[in-house]
């Protein structure tokens, strides 16, 4: 089977979609060598490279964000030409905008099934919180229009993949009739409790034995709720001046809020790492942390939270999001409202628990349920089923 992945959510500076695609290529190489893979993404120049089982097409596209290096894939004619040349057996689109529509049209022209992966719940991510600008009635109309858009696009796919049972239920309620629940995974060869390099990592970061190390990994952006993270840590620092340290790995439009916090009251208590390219180094940071803080309330899955648990570090956050199902330990002390005060209190309560025991148990569950080979074995069964049942005429 030749599978083509098509997305504009692809940055050289990592990201969940990029991680998923890299792991898919690794799975084909190691476990399904008879299959072939094509990847079409935006880039600084038009180019094609071969990476073992995968051929990667980069199409010149303008930069949307210089920091994250995300680009808008606007040259849809080039996409069409590549698909016509490669003639894949199945197309998967990770994009809810113009690239998604192009994938649907190309699938019909080539008479092959097209799958949509609903990686981001963009209606909530971008419309919630706009009420003060649109007014309640305007926001309600915008959400109604967005739901209709989601129905119109995703019902054109042969299947809509969603990595959250709860979100799959939401899309079904909205009228998307082809929803299939799936999962994302974790590289259990890298994200694991061993080796015990905690002492060396904490020394390198300047963290004392008696200090509680909090870790956040992800974009600094409104949809990730990082402003709540910053304000909750400011509260913690005021309440317990020498007890907590925060390491932030990631960059994004809300970086200035973090810098402001560093400049003002929390200068020596926050370390910011804009980008961590090495997965082994990232795993060391997860293992060194006492708690992983996940402030997001609109996540569809939560890869970083899963990686942290696989390394033996429990997660604290705000309850009720679509990623609750990937938390492999109890959430009884999680914040029950989206506020800095509630998140700060949840961190305080969790810090009093036996975190090493929680972490060990969570690691065992995460590594057994969410290994990438297991995830892709299930996903490729869906691919083959869709191909077998696809009506070409």
Q: What is each residue range found by the language model?
A:
Residues 83, 154, 275, 284-289:
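Short alpha-helical donor nucleotide-sugar binding micro-motif in glycosyltransferases
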Residues 57, 140-197:
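Donor nucleotide-sugar binding/catalytic pocket of nucleotide-sugar-dependent glycosyltransferases
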Residues 297:
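Aromatic "clamp/platform" in nucleotide-sugar-dependent glycosyltransferases that forms part
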